[in-house]
Amino acid sequence: QILGRPRLGFLVSAGNMDSMVNHYSVSKKRRKEDSYTPGGVMGKRPDYAVVVYCNLIRSAYKDVPIIAGGIEASLRRLAHYDYWSNKMKRSILLDAQADIISYGMGEHSIVELADALDSGLDIKDITFIDGTVYKTKSLESVYDYKLLPDYTELLEDKKRYAESFFVQYSNTDPFSGKRLVEPYEGKVYVVQNPPAKPLTQDEMDDVYALPYMRSY
């Protein structure tokens, strides 16, 4: 609430590294330093930061669009095995109560999302942007997709999870990747649109011509 109500929506990221990888070693011991915080101070962000941040925003603003992005949201966009808790977890979209995930680099999708919101479209109607993931209770308007195993199947059978992951991995190409649908007991569906197209040479030149701050 200190930030105030945004004009278009909240964009949420855990930073340039998954918060759990940032906080813990592979042996699950707490790290002593945070390389991505000024002074290397640990404890400046919570575990599972995207989930925490989004839920805090949702408790303060019930109807403001929340768009999650960055590596933490991207790698957890569909059901996934969480090494830290040794459990199969749902799409972060559901646990975070976010509206949309912008996955991957996001240079195109974030602009398209902003333009769509600025035009007055409701966040629930923005289902057509490549490089995004959204949730829906009906598949009536979803087309040309591959259906992944239901989340309940993944909990019960490791082989079904392996099959699901193979389909996901096989559809990461921006030119041939299909839309993927992951059901959750038939009550809600998480829909992953195909990956966003890569930047053109001119777009790439524009990005790297920006005045980035260097520390070396």
Regions found by a protein language model. Give the residues of each.
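Glycine-rich beta-alpha loop elements in corrinoid/cobalamin-binding modules
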Residues: I2-E185
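N-terminal [4Fe-4S]-dependent radical SAM core
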Residues: F166-Y216
